[in-house]
Curated annotation (Swiss-Prot):
Ranges of compositional bias, category Basic and acidic residues: 57-73
UniProt modification remark: Ubiquitinated by the CBC(fem-1) (Cul2-ElonginB-ElonginC) E3 ubiquitin-protein ligase complex, leading to its degradation.
GO cellular component, one term: cytoplasm
Full protein name: Histone RNA hairpin-binding protein
Annotated signal sequence range: none
Domain of life of the source: Eukaryota
Native source organism of the sequence: Caenorhabditis elegans
Gene that this polypeptide is encoded by: cdl-1
Compositional bias (Polar residues): 1-12, 147-156, 347-356
C-alpha cells in the first residue's frame, strides 16, 4: 500500500504579511459628498439670484480680509519715516551732532621735541578743535573748522587778529592770477579766467599781463557801444548759438597781435551786421592804442627810413672784364640800325637787294 506524501501545512509569516498588498480604500459615492439637504434652498431660486448672492458673499469676504490686514498693520509699531527722505549718511551725521551737542569741543595735545644744547625738550601744545555741524534744514559740512581760540594767542597783538566773518577766505581766480593788479585791472578781475580742468589750447595761454589788460579794455569799450547793448537785449546769453551769433574773442589764448586785431574787427563788424546797422569807422581801428605800441611802431619806422637812406647812398663798384671791352670795340665797327627791331636789325651792306646783280668792288682799296 503506497504511503501518502506528507503535505506541509500553510502558515502565514509576518514577512509574507508585510509583502501583502494593502487594503484598497473604498471611494465615496457622489451622493455621500453632496447631500440633498445642502442644496435644498437652491431648487426654488433662479440663476440670477444665485449669482447675486455669490457676489455679495465675495465682497463681504474681501471686506473682512481688508479689515484684518488693517488691524494687523495697526498693531505693529510704525517705522520712523523721514519726510525729507534723507540719505543714511545724513541721518548718521545728525545723530553725531546730537551726541556732541553737550561736548562740542575737545582738546588734543601734541608733543614736540626739540634739541637744545644736546638736551631734548618736549613741548606740549594744546589747541581746541571744534566740530561744526549745521542744522538739518541746511547742508551739512563734513569739514572740521578750527575755532578762533586755537588760532589766536591771548598775548598776541590785536593787529594780528582777524575778525571772524562769514565771507570766504578764497580770492577770485583772476586775483590769484594777477597779484599786482591796479585800477586798470578791475575789468580783468571781473572777467572769468581759465580753469584747471580746461584743456591746453594749441597756441597756449597768454601770460603777459599787459596784453591781457589791453585786450580787456578793447572788449569793454566795444561792449559800451549802443549796438552791443541792443544785441544783448535782443539775444540773451543762454539763447546764443555758436556759429550763428557773434562770438566774443577769447582773450586768454596766446594769439598774435595781428590775429587778435583781425578777430576784434570781425566781431565788431558782425555785431553791426546782426543788428542791421551800418558799421562805424571804429570797426576798422583799435579802440586802445597804448604808448608801448606807438613807441614800437615809431621805432620800426625810424629803422625803415634809416635802411632806405643807406641803400640810396650805397655805391657798388662794377669791375669790367677785358673780354667785355674787346667785344664792345668789335661791335663799334659795325653800323647797327637801332630804329629797327631786334629781329629785323641787320648789318648794313650794299643797298642792292638783288642777289643776282653784279657786285661793285670799286670802293675797295687795293693793297
Amino acid at each position: 500500500m503506497a504511503q501518502k506524501t506528507p503535505t506541509k501545512g500553510t502558515r502565514s509569516s509576518p514577512r509574507k504579511k508585510a509583502w501583502g498588498s494593502p487594503i484598497k480604500a473604498t471611494a465615496k459615492f457622489q451622493s455621500d459628498i453632496f447631500s440633498v439637504e445642502d442644496f435644498a434652498d437652491l431648487s426654488n431660486r433662479s440663476w440670477a439670484e444665485v449669482t447675486e448672492e455669490d457676489d455679495e458673499l465675495a465682497s463681504r469676504l474681501e471686506e473682512e480680509r481688508r479689515c484684518k490686514s488693517e488691524s494687523r498693520r495697526k498693531g505693529q509699531p510704525k517705522r520712523a519715516q523721514n519726510s525729507q527722505n534723507k540719505p543714511k549718511f545724513v541721518r548718521s551725521l545728525e545723530l553725531t551732532n546730537e551726541v556732541f551737542q553737550s561736548t562740542s569741543s575737545r582738546r588734543s595735545q601734541r608733543s614736540k621735541s626739540r634739541t637744545r644744547n644736546g638736551d631734548t625738550i618736549t613741548t606740549v601744545e594744546e589747541h581746541t578743535e571744534t566740530v561744526v555741524m549745521e542744522s538739518s534744514s541746511g547742508p551739512i559740512s563734513r569739514k572740521r573748522c578750527l575755532s578762533n581760540a586755537s588760532t589766536i594767542n591771548e598775548g598776541a597783538s590785536p593787529s594780528k587778529r582777524r575778525p571772524e566773518t562769514g565771507k570766504s577766505n578764497r580770492k577770485a581766480p583772476r586775483g590769484r592770477l594777477f597779484t599786482n593788479g591796479g585800477s586798470d585791472s578791475s575789468s580783468v578781475a571781473s572777467s572769468p579766467s581759465r580753469r584747471d580742468h580746461w584743456e591746453e589750447p594749441t597756441l597756449g595761454w597768454c601770460t603777459d599781463e599787459a596784453v591781457l589788460k589791453r585786450r580787456s579794455r578793447e572788449i569793454d569799450r566795444a561792449k559800451e557801444k549802443a549796438v552791443y547793448q541792443r544785441y544783448t537785449s535782443e539775444v540773451p546769453l543762454r539763447d546764443r548759438i555758436k556759429g550763428q551769433h557773434p562770438r566774443t574773442p577769447n582773450k586768454l589764448i596766446n594769439f598774435s597781435r595781428r590775429s587778435w586785431d583781425t578777430q576784434i574787427k570781425k566781431w565788431k563788424r558782425s555785431l553791426y551786421e546782426y543788428c542791421g546797422e551800418e558799421p562805424s569807422d571804429s570797426v576798422n581801428t583799435s579802440f586802445c592804442y597804448s604808448d608801448s605800441d606807438a613807441l614800437s611802431e615809431a621805432g620800426d619806422n625810424d629803422k625803415e627810413i634809416e635802411n632806405r637812406s643807406v641803400l640810396r647812398d650805397l655805391v657798388i663798384p662794377v669791375t669790367m672784364r677785358p673780354e667785355v671791352d674787346s667785344m664792345a670795340s668789335l661791335l663799334g665797327k659795325f653800323d647797327v640800325d637801332s630804329q629797327m627791331g631786334m629781329d629785323e636789325s641787320t648789318l648794313k651792306a650794299s643797298t642792292n637787294t638783288d642777289p643776282s646783280a653784279p657786285t661793285d668792288f670799286s670802293k675797295m682799296s687795293s693793297h
